[in-house]
Structure formats: C-alpha cells, structure tokens
C-alpha cells in the first residue's frame, strides 16, 4: 500500500483556513480544533510533536494557539508555511471582529448575532471537554504527571497563581526530574505508522538545520515590523498611543487575554478614555464568540480608540494598527525560537522540562474548561474568596436550560452521529438562532 503523500502547500492552506474559521471559544477549544484537524483526522503531525510545539508556545507571550499554528506551519512548509498558518488563524476572526466593531459602534448590539454565537459557544464547550479528556489520556502517564496537572489546576482555579509561575514551575520540575515523566508528556505518541511530518523529518535529518537560517531572518524582520510603527508614530496623538500601548501588551500577555484584561481595561478606560467599562465587557463578549484568539479583544479597543478620534475610517485604522503591533512579535518569537527547540527535541533534560509543561497544560486546559463552562451554562457566576483561596461558583438558580440542550445536541452530533466539526458548529449556531425565537 502506497503511503499518503506529504501535504502540498495548497492543501495545507485550505486546512489552516478551515482551522481559522472554526477556532471559536478561546485557546482550549482552538487547540482542540487544531489537534483534531492535523493529528486525529489527517495524521500530519504526531501527538508527541504537537505537544512539544505546544509546550514551547505556552512559554511565550501572546496567544498560544496562534503561535502553535505558526510553529506547525513552519515545520511543514518553512517560513511561508508559518506565515500562512499564523495569518489564516488570525484573519477570519479579525475580519469578523472588525465588522462587529463597526456594527457595535454604529448600531449597538444585534440580538440575531448574539443568538448565533450562543449556539456556537455551547458546541465549543463540548469540544473543550473532549480535548481535555483526550490530551489527559495521552499526556499523563504515571503519578507525577497527574499530580502536576492537578497542582496546576488548583494553582490557577483556586489560588490565582499567575500563569507564568505555573508554567515555569512545571518546567523546573520536569527539568530536575526528567525520569518521572519518561512514560508520558510530549514524548508520548500514539501507536501506528509515523505521522507524515515526523516521517519527513526522519527521512531528512538535516531538514530543520536547512530551514533555520530563513526562520531567523524572518524573525528579525518580524521584530522590525513590530517596532517601526512605535518609532514612526511616537508623539502622533491617539495613533502613537495605540502603537505604544498595544506593543507593550504584546510582551506581557502570558496566559492569554484574561491574564492582562484587568490592566487593559484600567488603562484603556481610565487613563486613555478610549471606551467605557461596559464597552470593554462588550468587546470581550465579541472576542469570546468570534473565531480566532481571544486577544482580538484588543482589536476592539483599538477600533473604538480610532473611531472616537476619526470616525469609522479611524476605527479601521486603529484596528489594523492594533493587529500589527499585537501579532508581529508572535511570528518573531516562533521563527527565532522554533529551530532551537526542534534541535533539542531529544535532549533528555529539555524533553523532561517540556513534558512537565505538558502535564501542567492539562491542568491549564481543565481550568479554562471550567471557566468557560460555568459562563456558558449559568447566567451568573460569583467569585468567592476565603483567605488565600478563591473560586468561581455558579448561581445554580441561573442555569440556562437552552445552553444545556444545545451542548447535549452538539455532543450527540459529534459523538453519536459522527458529524464533522464544521457541520456540528453550523447546526449548533442555527439551533441557537431558532431557540432565540421561542418564548423560553
């Protein structure tokens, strides 16, 4: 039997666009979509290499799912592959966010759009839970990884430990005791023939070395593209403020949008006065329900900053400027770091360190799943504090039967009827719209 051919660049483009269009619901759901597409369905990438790349991306500032797409795209087709995968992960969501920002600024909230996205969120919740179970089963082999995953979950969900400390702690534990992770972590692979990318790398031992110089050049260009608007627009009123503020955000967004949301809200609302607190919450709601990384909430803030200064045209300019200074460094980090990380793929201590991060990632995904699930299923969630501990608890009286019904529908479509991802999301969105017309 002839083995399947390595995917062409054109074929990869179609898949990266598909991932960009289907990546609703934040990083946990987006990573789940990517894993299903490139690992489960197409066998382009092995579990081991996917988790190895994810572990590195978790250490970087910026949206880890977008950086993971860039990393995998680079591995498959070099710099052009990384640029294509990373851009196609951003562009669909950015286009939707721009359109919704214009609608919001000119017309206010649109109930029909909210109903469609409500159905999508319920389906995405099912995807997140499925991804959590799948990754845990394959990544956690032995007592130590399970304990580390549980510790990471408790640190984030109960004790509000900053995300970078959780990841760095897991990295240190894995580095110090690589033997404790020998049976799992990013070295665990599913039995069967090697994935297409892994087979290609095995057949060309110098593949990474040949790709590295171009990646380094692309990384340096990415840094220049990131910094030139900051220098060029310095002192240029709102445009200089947008370039400077969001370029700072690009290097402190460890843990995704939620980790820096309070700071962004404080500065954008109280210091720059680009928008009000309710508008900030509306922007987060839009970012949660559009494809692409949640950090697109910054695009909404940039749009309103430009809109308040120069109308819709200014809003579009502010939106594009925000996107540029937010995402250009994300490409730079990957192109500069990925060749080194790939060369160290089999170094025992680095392998152990990244396996420790893999275990912590399971706890991170569990925390994101809990956060997302509570806010989808319940209309009201209370934050309870007791000494150093704090936890989100739902107001059980505010349970939303429609959300439970839509999540159940998505589970049946995915697991019982074996619907594809796109069809499941489309049916769920339509069901959410239909439910909005019922007198519930």
Language-model features and meaning:
Residues 1-60, 64, 71-290, 294-440:
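Multi-pass membrane proteins that catalyze or facilitate reactions on polyprenyl-/lipid-phosphate substrates
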């Amino acid at each position: 039997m002839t083995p399947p051919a390595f995917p062409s660049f054109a074929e990869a483009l179609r898949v990266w666009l598909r991932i960009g269009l289907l990546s609703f619901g934040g990083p946990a759901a987006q990573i789940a979509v990517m894993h299903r597409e490139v690992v489960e369905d197409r066998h382009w990438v092995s579990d081991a290499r996917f988790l190895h790349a994810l572990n590195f991306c978790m250490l970087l500032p910026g949206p880890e799912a977008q950086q993971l797409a860039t990393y995998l795209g680079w591995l498959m087709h070099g710099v052009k592959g990384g640029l294509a995968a990373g851009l196609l992960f951003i562009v669909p969501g950015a286009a939707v966010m721009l359109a919704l920002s214009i609608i919001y600024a000119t017309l206010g909230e649109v109930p029909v759009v909210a109903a469609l996205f409500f159905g999508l969120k319920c389906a995405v919740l099912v995807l997140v839970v499925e991804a959590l179970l799948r990754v845990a089963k394959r990544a956690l082999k032995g007592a130590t990884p399970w304990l580390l995953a549980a510790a990471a979950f408790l640190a984030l969900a109960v004790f509000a430990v900053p995300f970078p400390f959780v990841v760095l702690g897991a990295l240190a534990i894995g580095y110090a005791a690589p033997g404790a992770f020998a049976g799992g972590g990013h070295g665990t692979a599913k039995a069967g023939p090697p994935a297409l990318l892994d087979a290609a790398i095995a057949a060309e031992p110098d593949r990474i070395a040949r790709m590295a110089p171009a990646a380094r050049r692309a990384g340096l260009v990415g840094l220049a593209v990131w910094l030139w608007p900051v220098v060029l627009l310095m002192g240029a009123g709102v445009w200089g403020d947008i370039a400077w503020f969001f370029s700072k955000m690009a290097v402190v967004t460890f843990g995704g949008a939620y980790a820096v949301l309070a700071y962004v809200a404080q500065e954008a609302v109280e210091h720059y006065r680009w928008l009000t607190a309710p508008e900030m919450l509306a922007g987060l709601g839009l970012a949660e329900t559009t494809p692409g990384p949640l950090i697109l909430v910054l695009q909404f803030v940039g749009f309103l900053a430009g809109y308040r200064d120069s109308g819709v045209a200014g809003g579009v300019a502010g939106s594009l400027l925000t996107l540029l200074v937010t995402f250009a460094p994300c490409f730079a980090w990957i192109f500069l770091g990925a060749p080194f990380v790939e060369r160290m793929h089999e170094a025992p201590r680095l392998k152990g360190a990244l396996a420790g991060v893999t275990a912590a990632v399971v706890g991170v995904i569990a925390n994101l799943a809990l956060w997302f699930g509570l806010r989808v299923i319940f209309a009201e969630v209370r934050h309870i504090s007791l000494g150093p501990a704090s936890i989100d608890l739902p107001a059980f009286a505010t349970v939303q039967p429609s959300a439970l019904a839509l999540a159940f529908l998505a589970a049946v479509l995915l697991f019982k009827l074996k619907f594809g991802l796109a069809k499941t999301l489309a049916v769920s969105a339509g069901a959410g719209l239909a439910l909005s017309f019922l007198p519930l």
